[in-house]
């Protein structure tokens, strides 16, 4: 039986934390999130926090976006953003560096929903098939997204119809990711 998005995300998150520990002998550290509350925080030091992904007590669906744009969003999208809190995680997909976007806190979830709603409104105005971003790349004009119609994970050139299929679904995409830990 294939892995669910929830299982694949949990597996990648665990691989990421283990890779960080192997390289730095501690939990992941972040300097940019200091001062932002999150259930992920394990320890706060002067200019950095240590953190680890935390599974939500109950998975959520991002209905605010669906209601705002009057569009049912793909189940993989809800599973990806609605099952855990985490800092963003860097990874490699084949030869492409990405930063997997995550929800740090409930406040961050509100921000994500606003950004996603704006993204979908822009796509509707441009008459593009709706996509749901899940990661950024080194090229600020390209994002990794879930195609809302097919569920395929694609490399999406923002504001254009240029799209390249990366994986048949989100679970497959997550399973192919390799954690990248900065030195």
Curated annotation (Swiss-Prot):
Keyword annotations from UniProtKB, A to Z: Cell inner membrane, Cell membrane, Membrane
Top-rank lineage group of the source organism: Bacteria
GO CC terms of this entry: cytoplasmic side of plasma membrane
Family annotation (InterPro entries): Syd, Syd_sf
Keyword Membrane attributed: yes
Pfam families recorded: Syd
KW Metal-binding (keyword) present: no
Principal location: membrane
Compartment(s): Cell inner membrane
Membrane topology type: Peripheral membrane protein
Family indicated by similarity: Belongs to the Syd family.
Functional note: Interacts with the SecY protein in vivo. May bind preferentially to an uncomplexed state of SecY, thus functioning either as a chelating agent for excess SecY in the cell or as a regulatory factor that negatively controls the translocase function.
Protein name listed in UniProt: Protein Syd
Organism of origin: Aliivibrio fischeri (strain ATCC 700601 / ES114) (Vibrio fischeri)
